């Protein structure tokens, strides 16, 4: 409907829609940061409470906070602390690998409109529907306990929770069982996830399934370009299903890497969940922005086949980062934990 109106109509629509969302947030959304709101039962004040609380009675479970409470202060260190994680070798390797996959997925997604409109002559509605395979597969490998930044989301969420979530949980439980057996711990003992022992192989547990997922991502990305490069093939009836299916696998495998990567970075930064999420988003979104900026020139210069083959080879080029992390990551993590213990004791 908006495509039939003047060019500014869509921006006016987005302005109205975003304004309604902001108003709803101001009126109804309370502060959820645990250090401020606790488990949701603490009385909020100032900007932390929604405006609706000014006109209604507090729920019966609301309690006054301890008088000794002092609100967390925002200082320069608050913004610098996430950047300091880049000094850690194992964390940096995880961020670079995850950022590379994110950039390539973003390049596939951002180039879809131009390629499909040119090759398959789709209208605006059909172009929108072409994103469904990408979007539903985003949730195919989405973890319910891991944050992702994917803008395309669909019914695959249900399937995703049972695939990558179960795979990662199984790998972690297997590693935990082996650790208990080797250390003579009772079967009922559960390792504290926020304070894992230095000799627990968390890197192996988290990266166990990354190898085949990355291989499938490389194959799908490389084949995707060639599925769009030959007019004699792309003109065949129903051929559009082939690149759409490959997009499904590209999005599914890339989002599996995102979920694994975010979990891995969080495990390497116990107690720094906000900082690890912030630096992960900063790195991969920066790399994604660079990729989106050059993808059109890459396709124009090499064609879809050559361009996406190069992107597949780029992924292969960063796979050694996983190998390095697999073998040397545990040592670097133990060294970091040792420095932390020494710092706390001094």
How would you label these PLM feature ranges?
Residues 61-68, 74-81, 98, 109, ...:
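Generic, low-specificity signal for short hydrophobic/alpha-helical stretches with a mild N-terminal bias
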Residues 6-92, 142-149, 166-188, 202, ...:
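Central mid-sequence intracellular linker of multi-pass
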């Amino acid at each position: 409907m908006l495509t039939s109106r003047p060019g500014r109509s869509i921006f006016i629509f987005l302005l109205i829609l975003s304004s309604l969302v902001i108003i709803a947030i101001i009126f109804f959304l309370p502060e959820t940061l645990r250090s401020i709101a606790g488990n949701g039962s603490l009385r909020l004040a100032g900007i932390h409470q929604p405006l609706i609380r000014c006109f209604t009675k507090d729920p019966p479970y609301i309690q006054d906070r301890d008088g000794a409470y002092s609100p967390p202060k925002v200082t320069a260190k608050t913004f610098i602390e996430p950047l300091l994680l880049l000094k850690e070798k194992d964390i940096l390797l995880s961020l670079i690998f995850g950022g590379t996959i994110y950039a390539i997925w973003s390049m596939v997604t951002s180039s879809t409109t131009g390629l499909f409109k040119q090759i398959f002559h789709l209208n605006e509605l059909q172009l929108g529907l072409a994103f469904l395979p990408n979007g539903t597969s985003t949730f195919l490998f989405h973890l319910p306990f891991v944050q992702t930044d994917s803008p395309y989301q669909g019914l695959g969420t249900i399937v995703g929770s049972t695939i990558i979530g179960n795979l990662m949980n199984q790998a972690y439980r297997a590693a935990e069982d082996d650790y208990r057996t080797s250390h003579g711990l009772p079967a009922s003992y559960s390792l504290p996830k926020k304070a894992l022992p230095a000799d627990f192989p968390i890197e192996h547990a988290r990266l166990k399934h990354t190898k085949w997922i990355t291989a499938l991502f490389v194959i799908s990305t490389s084949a995707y370009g060639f599925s769009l490069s030959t007019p004699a093939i792309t003109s065949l009836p129903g051929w559009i299903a082939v690149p759409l299916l490959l997009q499904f696998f590209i999005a599914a495998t890339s989002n599996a890497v995102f979920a694994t990567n975010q979990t891995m970075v969080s495990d390497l930064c116990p107690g720094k969940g906000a900082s690890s999420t912030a630096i992960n988003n900063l790195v991969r979104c920066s790399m994604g922005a660079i990729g989106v900026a050059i993808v059109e020139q890459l396709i124009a210069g090499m064609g879809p086949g050559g361009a996406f083959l190069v992107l597949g080879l780029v992924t292969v080029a960063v796979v050694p980062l996983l190998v390095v992390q697999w073998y040397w990551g545990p040592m670097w993590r133990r060294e970091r934990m040792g420095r932390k213990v020494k710092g706390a004791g001094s």
